[in-house]
Amino acid sequence: MSFIFNRETFEDNSFNEVLREKLMRALNLHDRTVGSSSGAMTTGTGAVECSGAAAAGQRPPRSKGGFSKVDILKSGIIVKKVEFPTIPKLEILDLDVSIQSKSLIKGICKVSCRDAMVQITTEIESNLLLLHVNSSPKFTTPKLISNDSFTVPITMTFDKLHLEAITNIFVKNTGVGISFNDVNLDFRLQCSIKLLQSSIEKRLKASMEEVFKDVLPSVIFNMSQRWFTHGETVVPTVDKSMVSSDTPVQPRMILDESDLSDLSPANMLRLSTLVSSRQTLCLNPTAVDTISTIPGCLERQNLHRFNLRFPSLYNYYSNKEQQGAHNNEKNRVEHLKLWGRSSSNPIPTRASFKVENTLPKEVLDSNSYDVRVITAIQTKMYERASNDVVLRRRKIKMRSRKPSKANKDAVSPAQNDSGTSSCSNVASELPHASLQANPQSDEIDPAPEGGPNAEDAYKEELEDSGLRAPQDFPALENVTPVLAQLPNQQRSRLGSPLSAGRPTPLLSPLDDSHWLLQKRDPQDLRTTLYSPIRNGRFYVMPQPQLDTKEASAFLLENGKRFGFVGLLNNHNLKWGNDPPPPYREVSITQ
């Protein structure tokens, strides 16, 4: 069983006009101005325009479940054109007619429609911020300086519309109910705003399931009610919550005044602080001494302030020095410079916040740092760092060094002791040369730095002062030369470490060389031009007479022993509690 559609009905333009009017009324069902036959008027061109507040751009937000939705439509939807170039096909697959007091018809049909075209136009709101502000509570939205409405007209054309679906039809004495199953819909969209064309097409195809499930069945049922009421106008029932008054729509109050007393004052203060902080577009806060505008909250633009206040070696000692200053104005200027502020530059710059973790130069010069404080700061910085960093300790490995050529030629301490005893025996048999000390000077004259003339002049100066050149003594046998292969190097004047004000006697050249040998490493030891150690041989200085009063006379005991530094003391060559020479004074006794 099937129905045959009358071709003349679809070819007549009056059918398209009626269908366009009904489609427009269905699309504007939720608008307060479109709900009756007088809510729309037809122009001379055949287009239907919305009257009232819909044309003026006022549209209440739709509500579902008590929550308002953001609606970008600023006016009603106008259906400008509807065409059916191909006659639709309707095939009845099953039909059940019940003969009862209430007539009821059930059937299953297959609907096929091709090459249909629908063109609609409307106005949308392009300022989405305005829509969100109007539909949000006041305490969560900032106060915007400029937030005006900006409407944009848009026209959409649906052509090459192809529809195939299986429908279940229920016909009662009050209307017709249709449900769609297995819907296959395809169309092409042309939008006046090309930037939104692809996005709108995807959203419409995704929402077609809801259209055939809810929208079309309600439209067909409302239209059928007029037929079953013998042409009487039936106003569709609209929920009272969807109809608004003439006053502007106010956002819904979540909390009443009675509910505010139950809230925590601390939480409300934090919320108000959060709202006030969002009322500016400034990236840098205006306060100088605060890290952020919200206490306990670190913002990204204020991260440099937190880094400056983080304990480091530089800012710890800098703040410590600033606390002890007396000039408050100078401290304020230095504080502003540390933060990158000045009278001409109130907003800090990024380059001025780089602070290195080093001690200030003034602290190092004054030696006023504490090792325990430095350790605590460095430990705290390591603990706050990432856990991926492995702590490394500095290790010092002590290894025995291989003796070099210079060390092989040097005399060991044991050989020095044996050489000392052998030299002391030989010294008792040799004639002595007098050595006179200069009590007015506690420094050793350096060797001349000039040529041969300078050397002769230096020798004459020594002879005038009472120091005679060493005589030709027989060479000491069985004595290992000390540093014979090292080049000669002149030695600067050496100051006496004794207390100032008292003259100290000069050490003998042999004692002086032995003292240098003990103080410095063998590889760093250099002999002077007039050193007793010369050409690998010892020159023995003669012992002065006992009746002389020079301090140098008591360096050698009665001419029997050499007075090497480290061996001469007041305990018969036994080491005692006296400080080691040359850091002691030689007592002069008769």
UniProtKB/Swiss-Prot annotation:
Compositional bias (Polar residues): 413-427
Predominant subcellular localization, coarse grouping: mitochondrion
One annotated GO biological process: mitochondrion-endoplasmic reticulum membrane tethering
Record localization: Mitochondrion outer membrane
Comp. bias regions, Basic residues: 393-405
Membrane topology: Multi-pass membrane protein
Classification via InterPro entries: Mdm34, SMP_LBD
Tree of life domain: Eukaryota
One GO term describing the cellular component: ERMES complex
Annotated keywords: Lipid transport, Lipid-binding, Membrane, Mitochondrion, Mitochondrion outer membrane, Transmembrane, Transmembrane beta strand, Transport
Any GO MF annotation of the entry: lipid binding
Location of region: Disordered: 393-456
Domain called SMP-LTD: residue spans: 1-225
This protein's record includes keyword Membrane: yes
Biological role stated in the UniProt entry: Component of the ERMES/MDM complex, which serves as a molecular tether to connect the endoplasmic reticulum (ER) and mitochondria. Components of this complex are involved in the control of mitochondrial shape and protein biogenesis, and function in nonvesicular lipid trafficking between the ER and mitochondria. MDM34 is required for the interaction of the ER-resident membrane protein MMM1 and the outer mitochondrial membrane-resident beta-barrel protein MDM10.
Listed PANTHER family: MITOCHONDRIAL DISTRIBUTION AND MORPHOLOGY PROTEIN 34
Family to which the UniProt record says this protein belongs: Belongs to the MDM34 family.
Notes concerning its domains: Lacks alpha-helical transmembrane segments, suggesting that it resides in the membrane via beta-sheet conformations similar to those predicted for other outer membrane proteins and porin. The SMP-LTD domain is a barrel-like domain that can bind various types of glycerophospholipids in its interior and mediate their transfer between two adjacent bilayers.
Protein name listed in UniProt: Mitochondrial distribution and morphology protein 34
Gene name per UniProt: MDM34
